[in-house]
Amino acid sequence: MSGGIMDEEIEIPPFFLCPISLEIMKDPVIVSTGITYDRDSIEKWLFAGKKNSCPVTKQDITDADLTPNHTLRRLIQSWCTLNASYGVERIPTPRPPICKSEIEKLIRDSASSHENQVKCLKRLRQIVSENATNKRCLEAAGVPEFLANIVSNDSENGSLTDEALNLLYHLETSETVLKNLLNNKKDNNIVKSLTKIMQRGMYESRVYATLLLKNILEVADPMQSMTLKPEVFTEVVQILDDRISQKATKAAMHILVNICPWGRNRHKAVEAGVISVIIELLMDESFTSERRGPEMAMVVLDLLCQCAEGRAEFLNHGAAIAVVCKKILRVSQTASDRAVRVLLSVGRFCATPALLHEMLQLGVVAKLCLVLQVSCGGKTKEKAKELLKLHARVWKDSPCLPKNMILAYPC
């Protein structure tokens, strides 16, 4: 238990414990429903978890402001002092959250010189690291817009841009602010700025730029997604190809999942060379060691194989069929379903004697028959059956098909 307390020697008053962490509260605060929580726990619940209900009462928290419960905090401190002989450590008095006016002054003063800008960013980094309440205060004071302006306009000073980019990511800004940044056309477009950093930036900045671009494009409306420039696709694919970090790779893949449902974007992604890069990734054990990466990769391949250019690029890669076939029944239901959809797309629209023979030799037909036999999603089975029936004349009586699979072949 917290503070080195021996629970067999001393009983902790239950109202000293945070309802979330069940540990002694170090900084008790009251939410709008009247329940007291430890600040760190409720901030994680509200901001990191993006929940807006009270964990105890389940009522909506209408006001995100947290009111310090000074009376309870002093009572806990007194209790800690009285029980020091039992090994109870006194909780320190927490520092008060930063105020909005102080932040606004900090931003105003930074405009006077480059040195003041550097000092401002250092102070902001310190404030961000203290608690989530400070992050919300910085957001209210316009810090995300201030940082985005540096990222967009201060290309001559790489270190300043890198620091602003780092801070902007760690602010964990709300969807509303992300939309404002995306819609702000007064300064340089934030998507364009992040794309440039992904192209020219240092290692860490490329990672943060990719993570930020993912967050921003998640709140984009369909028209904003459909009008993305080809350079965005080029740099996202380059991030995947460079494999600079697992975080960046997953973020880049997530971006493609979000923007490739739109027809125009599929063509841009194919032209950027994403299909061959994804197939190479699917052959990389470090990428396939976790389920989510291969799942997203299969989703993107499925989306891109819905256009003729995508199917052509897919079949241009010598390992494509084998790699996709291998993921069926090996990763997850989602991955299996998307893999079968990819094979159905190429089998329906690109069937040639050579392709059908290749699919037979690589075990695709046997794998599809297996899908029909095992516990698998109904839609996945339907698509597997559709592909098998489509080419039954070629596949069903082939000596390449194992005898035990011939019995499973749909009539």
UniProtKB/Swiss-Prot annotation:
CDD domains: RING-Ubox_PUB
EC number per UniProt: 2.3.2.27
Knockout or disruption consequences: Increased tolerance to drought stress.
Primary location: cytoplasm
Annotated ranges, domain U-box: 11-86
Record Gene3D superfamilies: Leucine-rich Repeat Variant, Zinc/RING finger domain, C3HC4 (zinc finger)
Descriptive protein name: E3 ubiquitin-protein ligase PUB23
Originating species: Arabidopsis thaliana
Taxon lineage: Eukaryota, Viridiplantae, Streptophyta, Embryophyta, Tracheophyta
